[in-house]
């Protein structure tokens, strides 16, 4: 099992994730995504969007505002019910979520005893003000989830897109929660990104679609992101674990170095949200669906799929990371990312920094850069250049050598097994396209 310290070291060293405000000592639970991190996030987001919107004719996208009317959060139950139970250790002053520790045992931090304060409720929403006057009339919240922006746009999307039940609305965006404890690198933070889809169905079809989306989402992690199946599992919520809006819920959990934790939730939200907004807005017809064929009118039920984009980044790094002992006794660090997710698809290396080789290398770069994100490197030994690309997950390295001048062929070196092939320059584009399309992961890595 990979160690968390190895992932954190790689992430900072190679430019995936940096500590936010590091030059000023850092800000706990806040992280910046570097050149490779933004590419990995973008690629995961792209695959999610494709799987949700492009591969389903009845799902469309939305990008709702972070700031919304505070009445929305009162209607949704977040103002009154979106809270965690918090305790403090009276000896060391450490703060914990009450459901994360055993209050009958010693403090996890100081180990002195179980001298905790009584559990008290802590609302997770960030409150701020819009306008020049800071009073109750200008209060707004940073959204704690993207879902409510979808629900209040139910009628807008339904009418403008001419959709019929069942249909879905997908959204990727930032959410904010004033977590009692931020921990495990980018896993639990106050600012994060969600990939959510709300699927509206007839109440009688809720169970059928709930089962469909459970399997669909698990397949996404295994078949699209190529996450190891033996590190994924479903976990059902019992009645004591359900959120205030949910009738049923399943989590997809991944086995991180710190244990199995949620990466996506699939929830049967019933008609809770639409009914609440109909009530609080006093516009019930806006949230009602009229089936023109059957003449039936009803408030749709909702199935939610809610994945953490930032958690998916961490999961992908953990699952792809490997260390290999080579025959010469050296150690090779490899990120076995699916080529679709890799920040760079190709690295181009002139064997030596000679003009006759660099000119060809630059020409190949320009021919391919419209379709592939490419890293160009002409410094250092070829072995060290290979190792640098292995460590950031680049699947294919193309080397231009003196034979290239003679026969217009290059060496293509594959990341996972380090095999090399001579490929004609004119065939390079189609060769790499085919390799990416036919890529198969070895889950026994």
Curated annotation (Swiss-Prot):
TM helices/strands, residue ranges: none
Keyword RNA-binding assigned: no
Compartment(s): Cytoplasm
Keywords recorded for this protein, A-Z: Aminoacyl-tRNA synthetase, ATP-binding, Cytoplasm, Ligase, Nucleotide-binding, Protein biosynthesis
Reaction catalyzed: tRNA(Gly) + glycine + ATP = glycyl-tRNA(Gly) + AMP + diphosphate
Gene3D superfamilies given in the database record: Anticodon-binding domain, Bira Bifunctional Protein, Domain 2
Binding residues for substrate: 97, 145, 192-196, 304-308
InterPro entries noted in UniProt: aa-tRNA-synt_IIb, aa-tRNA-synth_II, aa-tRNA-synth_II/BPL/LPL, Anticodon-bd, Anticodon-bd_dom_sf, Gly-tRNA_synthase/POLG2, Gly_tRNA_ligase_bac, GlyRS-like_core
Gene Ontology BP annotations: glycyl-tRNA aminoacylation
GO CC annotations, alphabetized: cytoplasm
Family designation: Belongs to the class-II aminoacyl-tRNA synthetase family.
Quaternary structure (record): Homodimer.
HAMAP family xref list: Gly_tRNA_synth_B
The protein's role, per its UniProt record: Catalyzes the attachment of glycine to tRNA(Gly).
Protein name, UniProt field: Glycine--tRNA ligase
Gene expressing this chain: glyQS
């Amino acid at each position: 099992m990979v160690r968390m310290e190895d992932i954190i070291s790689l992430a900072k060293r190679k430019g995936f994730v940096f500590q936010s405000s590091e030059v000023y000592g850092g800000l706990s639970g806040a992280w910046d995504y570097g050149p490779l991190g933004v590419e990995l996030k973008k690629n995961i987001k792209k695959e999610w969007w494709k799987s949700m919107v492009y591969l389903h004719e009845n799902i469309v996208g939305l990008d709702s505002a972070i700031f919304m009317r505070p009445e929305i959060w009162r209607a949704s139950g977040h103002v009154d019910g979106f809270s965690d139970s918090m305790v403090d250790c009276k000896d060391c002053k450490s703060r914990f979520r009450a459901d994360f520790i055993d209050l009958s045992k010693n403090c996890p931090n100081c180990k002195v005893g179980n001298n905790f304060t009584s559990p008290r409720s802590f609302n997770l929403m960030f409150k701020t003000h819009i306008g020049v006057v800071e009073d109750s009339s200008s209060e707004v919240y940073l959204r704690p989830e993207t879902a409510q922006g979808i629900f209040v746009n139910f009628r807008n999307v339904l009418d403008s897109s001419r959709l019929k039940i069942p249909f879905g609305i997908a959204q990727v965006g930032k959410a904010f929660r004033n977590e009692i404890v931020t921990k495990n690198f980018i896993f639990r933070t106050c600012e994060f990104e969600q990939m959510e889809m709300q699927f509206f169905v007839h109440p009688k079809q809720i169970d059928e679609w709930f089962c469909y989306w459970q399997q669909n989402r698990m397949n996404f992690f295994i078949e699209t992101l190529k996450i190891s199946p033996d590190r994924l599992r479903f976990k059902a919520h019992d009645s004591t674990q359900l959120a205030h809006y949910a009738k049923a819920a399943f989590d997809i959990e991944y086995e991180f170095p710190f244990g199995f934790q949620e990466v996506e939730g699939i929830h049967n939200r019933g008609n809770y949200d639409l009914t609440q907004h109909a009530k609080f807005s006093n516009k019930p017809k806006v949230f009602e669906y009229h089936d023109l064929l059957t003449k039936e009118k009803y408030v749709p039920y909702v199935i939610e799929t809610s994945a953490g984009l930032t958690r998916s980044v961490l999961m992908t790094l953990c699952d792809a990371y490997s260390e290999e002992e080579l025959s010469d006794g050296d150690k090779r660090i490899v990120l076995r990312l699916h080529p679709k997710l890799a920040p760079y698809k190709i690295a181009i290396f002139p064997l030596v920094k000679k003009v006759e080789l660099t000119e060809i290398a630059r020409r190949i770069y320009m021919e391919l850069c419209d379709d592939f994100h490419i890293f160009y490197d002409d410094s250092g030994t070829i072995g060290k250049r290979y190792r640098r690309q292995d460590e950031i997950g680049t699947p294919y390295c193309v080397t231009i050598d003196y034979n290239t001048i003679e026969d217009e062929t290059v060496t293509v070196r594959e990341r996972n097994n380090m095999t090399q092939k001579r490929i004609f320059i004119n065939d390079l584009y189609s060769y790499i396209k085919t390799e990416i399309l036919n890529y198969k992961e070895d889950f026994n890595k």
